[in-house]
Curated annotation (Swiss-Prot):
Residues 64-142 are annotated as: Domain II. GO terms for molecular function: ATP binding; four-way junction DNA binding; four-way junction helicase activity. Gene3D superfamilies: 5' to 3' exonuclease, C-terminal subdomain, DNA helicase RuvA subunit, C-terminal domain, Nucleic acid-binding proteins. Residues 148-197 are annotated as: Domain III. Residues 143-147 are annotated as: Flexible linker. InterPro entries: DNA_helicase_Holl-junc_RuvA_I (IPR013849), Hlx-hairpin-Hlx_DNA-bd_motif (IPR003583), NA-bd_OB-fold (IPR012340), RuvA (IPR000085), RuvA_2-like (IPR010994), RuvA_C (IPR011114), RuvA_C_sf (IPR036267). Has three domains with a flexible linker between the domains II and III and assumes an 'L' shape. Domain III is highly mobile and contacts RuvB. This is Holliday junction branch migration complex subunit RuvA. Residues 1-63 are annotated as: Domain I. Its main location: cytoplasm. One of its GO terms (cellular component) is Holliday junction helicase complex. The RuvA-RuvB-RuvC complex processes Holliday junction (HJ) DNA during genetic recombination and DNA repair, while the RuvA-RuvB complex plays an important role in the rescue of blocked DNA replication forks via replication fork reversal (RFR). RuvA specifically binds to HJ cruciform DNA, conferring on it an open structure. The RuvB hexamer acts as an ATP-dependent pump, pulling dsDNA into and through the RuvAB complex. HJ branch migration allows RuvC to scan DNA until it finds its consensus sequence, where it cleaves and resolves the cruciform DNA. It is found in: Cytoplasm.
Length: 197
């Protein structure tokens, strides 16, 4: 079993990274959270989950043990596979996801691509008690669901979702940009968001 892989970043995209470890390149699936954490590094260490199936051997990598722990909790829920769990962890940071589950915010959870209302409710029911003991610090889901600059926020999120980005991921990125630059016009917010999504 692989616990972690440490090596040079040979290639990186928002969804995958190739780590060169002693001349061997490991193709690893990553979330947007992990991408944000490692994109400017030349060398990194990723905590690994191995998904071994009849037709594939897939590696998922995480910049923190907490993110991997949440991934394992998510795939323990009936109907949630590795790619869906990675999509959820791309849309919400570990602390945000814990906040959403703790507060039972199924509306925000179902904005993640591929998650319907029933699945969102199942995640909350199955994981609420486990999240309470996970040790990940939670963020109040209302904090990023309703940022102050709502008009520009809503306009930018609408534009990004029309371009095919997941609503939850778009909301998160736009909220972060408006926190950094509260006076930014909507065009600038969208341009900055496109670089981060």
């Amino acid at each position: 079993m692989i616990e972690y892989i440490k090596g040079d970043i040979a290639e990186i995209t928002p969804a995958t990274v190739v780590l060169d470890c002693n001349g061997m390149g490991y193709g690893i699936n990553i979330s947007l959270n992990t991408y944000s954490a490692i994109q400017n590094q030349s060398n990194t260490k990723l905590y690994i989950y191995e998904a071994i199936r009849e037709d594939a051997y897939v590696l998922y990598g995480f910049s923190t043990k907490q993110e991997r722990e949440l991934f394992l909790l998510l795939i323990s829920v009936s109907g949630i596979g590795g790619n869906t769990a990675r999509m959820i962890l791309s849309a919400l940071s570990p602390s945000e996801l814990c906040g959403v589950i703790s507060s039972g915010n199924d509306k925000l959870l179902k904005t993640v691509k591929g998650i319907g209302l029933k699945t969102a409710q199942r995640i909350i029911v199955d994981l609420k008690d486990k999240i309470a003991t996970s040790g990940v610090e939670t963020v109040n889901s209302e904090m990023f669901a309703n940022p102050g600059n709502t008009e520009i926020h809503d306009e930018a999120v609408a534009a990004l979702t029309m371009l095919g980005f997941a609503q939850a991921a778009s909301q998160k990125v736009v909220a972060a940009i408006l926190k950094e630059e509260p006076a930014a016009p909507v065009e600038k917010v969208i341009k900055l968001a496109l670089k981060r999504l």
